[in-house]
């Protein structure tokens, strides 16, 4: 029995020359906790075995599709092929999600800090769409550090779309703090995520 589901690509979005996202179908038997990851891969001509890599699931566990957020690497064993996906293509998704970056491993508290750079944002895309996160914490502070402003993938989701969500909107407005950070261009939050977290983000900790 195969360890992978065969899923069909539903959409592909290229944020810029460095990052892209894609969605695919989701087998109805796939169950996961927000924040977990799966192995994603492709079967390539001339290759006996599929090429697979670990990818955090960017979609929430209540959504019918799967979403993944990836960097583009021209000589990457998988990403050099994955970045050329088209709607209708087949991708492999492992049947057993794993990972401990999940809410069930955390005690409820006052604040939940989510620190990420680049595609490290992926698991937090699912967690920030999890109603349980807003039930368990008074504030959720998401920091996303990138080099350039154009690298701020999902910026509109956090500045507009989530707040307008039919079910999550009110919770997001009340509890989610989005803190985008750019290190190599002028920006409202400019610098490295580690330095800004210990300085500017301290204001949020003291409030």
Put a short name on every predicted segment.
Residues 43, 96-97:
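Short, surface-exposed secondary-structure boundary micro-motifs
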Residues 133-187:
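Cysteine-dependent PTP/DSP-like catalytic domain, specifically the C-terminal lobe
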Residues 123-132:
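Histidine-anchored nucleotide/phosphate-binding helix
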Residues 97-107:
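A short, basic/flexible loop-to-alpha-helix module at the beginning of a structural domain
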